[in-house]
Design a protein with these regions (language model features):
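Short clusters of hydrophobic/aromatic residues that line enzyme substrate/ligand-binding pockets
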Residues: 46, 159, 189-192
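Flexible loop/turn segments at secondary-structure boundaries
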Residues: 17-19, 44-45, 86-88, 118-120, ...
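A C-terminal junction/extension of Radical SAM enzymes
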Residues: 76, 107-109, 113-184, 220
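Radical SAM/AdoMet-radical enzyme domain recognition
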Residues: 1-113
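A structure-centric signal for secondary-structure junctions around beta-strands
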Residues: 6, 163, 209-212
Length: 253
């Protein structure tokens, strides 16, 4: 900022510690444009999963209030809702609640995301139907984050993992290629104190797989999540399921 270099900031947060004072004082300094906040379900489910020591910070109502505060200062919020086979009914209830609060708030969007790599994963063949039923609950299905990106130019990389000069850094200063690698010592590239040890892995970019080259969703996905693929989980980005679900909702009207 002092050097006159243009920049902006985005954040992934649980929103528990965000206050109006913080938003007013620091967000302009950081040029904060976007925050992603995860809600794991309706009040009882959310508070059960989070289980904060400070029950007040972890209150569902506190998070909802903080999201409202953020949006009031014209910072966009994507509410990420993780979905597996066990919580689909609760997710429907959550979206009904969110629509009552944020249905007309243009600064708040939704990011329904399937959990991958667990025994409770929603089967790939069921995901479009699951999202279709969620989109039907919304006044404006275009509030779903991926739909907002439908008309943007095609991707040339799925995420920052494919960029040789992009990194994820954990709280101890360890450097990784991807946020999904954090906490896995075998995937560490180095640290911010001594530098990157594995220069070849830093530069290495996974090649687009043959099945992805032929996929109609490739321009919106470009191979998807390499971390999920390496774990034998579904690598496809949410767009792969949201786009056909959204098109079905449009055709119903």
């Amino acid at each position: 900022r002092e050097a006159g270099v243009p920049y902006y900031t985005s954040m992934i947060s649980n929103a528990s510690l965000i206050t109006e004072e913080l938003v007013k004082e620091y967000f302009p300094v950081w040029n904060m444009k976007h925050i992603q906040v995860t809600l794991d379900g309706t009040k009882d489910e959310y508070e059960r999963i989070k289980a904060y020591d400070d029950k007040n910070l972890g209150r569902f109502e506190n998070i909802i209030n903080n999201i409202t505060v953020i949006s009031k200062y014209k910072v966009s919020v994507d509410i990420r809702v993780n979905i597996d086979q066990k919580n689909i009914e609760d997710v429907h209830k959550l979206f009904n609640q969110l629509e009552k609060i944020y249905g007309d708030n243009s600064m708040v969007r939704y990011y329904p995301a399937f959990i991958n790599g667990s025994s409770c994963d929603v089967p790939v063949e069921s995901r479009v139907d699951v999202l279709y039923n969620i989109l039907k609950l919304m006044k404006d299905p275009a509030k779903v984050m991926s739909v907002n990106r439908l008309y943007k130019q095609p991707l040339t990389a799925p995420c920052h993992r494919a960029q040789p000069n992009a990194f994820s850094i954990d709280a101890e200063g360890n450097v990784y290629k991807c946020e999904h690698d954090i906490g896995r010592p075998d995937n560490k590239l180095g640290d911010i104190f001594t530098g990157v040890d594995d220069e070849e892995r830093r530069k290495n970019v996974a090649q687009l797989r043959e099945e992805c080259e032929k996929c109609v969703f490739s321009p919106k996905c470009y191979g998807g999540c390499e971390s999920n693929f390496l774990k034998s989980a579904d690598p496809c980005m949410a767009d792969r399921y949201i786009i056909p679900a959204y098109m079905s909702v449009i055709l119903d009207k």
